[in-house]
Amino acid sequence: MKNKFAALVITLFVLVLAIDNVTTECLEGCECNQDSTGKTCRPKQGSNVSPAVCLAQYCYHGYC
């Protein structure tokens, strides 16, 4: 029974993280990469934000 409960908790945690990532607007200095099917973020033109920082974020379709 403990294993089933632990699996449920882990599954819910991963689901919450997935939902949070999908609905996150890109950080300041980043913009949504419309060419990417994963809707990742990229640095805005002239921004000094690292590409790695932007790529760590996902953007919701409405922000693209």
From Swiss-Prot:
Expressed by the venom gland. GO terms for molecular function: toxin activity. Transmembrane segments: none annotated. GO terms for cellular component: extracellular region. Contains 3 disulfide bonds. It is found in: Secreted. Keywords: Disulfide bond, Neurotoxin, Secreted, Signal, Toxin. Residues 1-24 form the signal peptide. It comes from the Eukaryota. Belongs to the scolopendra neurotoxin 6 family. This is Putative neurotoxin 6. It comes from Scolopendra mutilans.
